[in-house]
Amino acid sequence: MQAEYGDKVEFIVVYIREAHALDGASPRGVGGDHPIVEEPLTIDERLTVAKRCDAKLDLTPFTVVIDDIEDTANTSYAAHPDRLYLVDKEGRVGYAGGRGPREFFPNELEDAIREELGLEPIEHEEEEEDRGFPARRRPR
């Protein structure tokens, strides 16, 4: 999506608290392949962990910002563990996706982006079932 719409839409990754911190409730997550880090206690620690995440996932095409240590963005947007949002040209939430991974549907975000940009809707290829969760399409 960033390659398709990045010249018209700014894609921002907000690094929030750790979903699978070693000292958290779910240190290994579902797949057990998450990096082992403790929950940062200071903004400098969070910045260090966020930089490692940025490098590991190669988030180069995106603007990456970090939530403050009080988790203001995370709390305000119910972002944990991950969410997709579209903020429209007036600064209002134009799309709020469900909580990931079970309610994480990028096609819905693309539909909302296209609508915001005044582009014709597109038909999405049927998504394969991914991560063991059934594919879903936004009702028209």
Predicted regions and their residues:
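Gly/Pro-rich cap/lid or specificity-loop segments adjacent to the active site
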Residues: 40, 44, 62, 69-72
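Short N-terminal micro-motifs specific to bacterial/archaeal maturation
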Residues: 37, 41, 64, 100-103
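Beta-propeller folds
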Residues: 3, 55-61, 110, 122-123
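Hydrophobic/aromatic beta-strand patches that form the interior of the parallel beta-sheet core
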Residues: 12-14, 65, 85
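Structural microenvironment flanking redox-active thiols in thiol-disulfide oxidoreductases
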Residues: 1-57
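Loop/turn elements at helix/coil->beta-strand transitions in domains of secreted/extracellular proteins
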Residues: 6-10, 58-62, 81-82, 89
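Thiol-/selenol-based redox modules, centered on thioredoxin-like
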Residues: 68-140
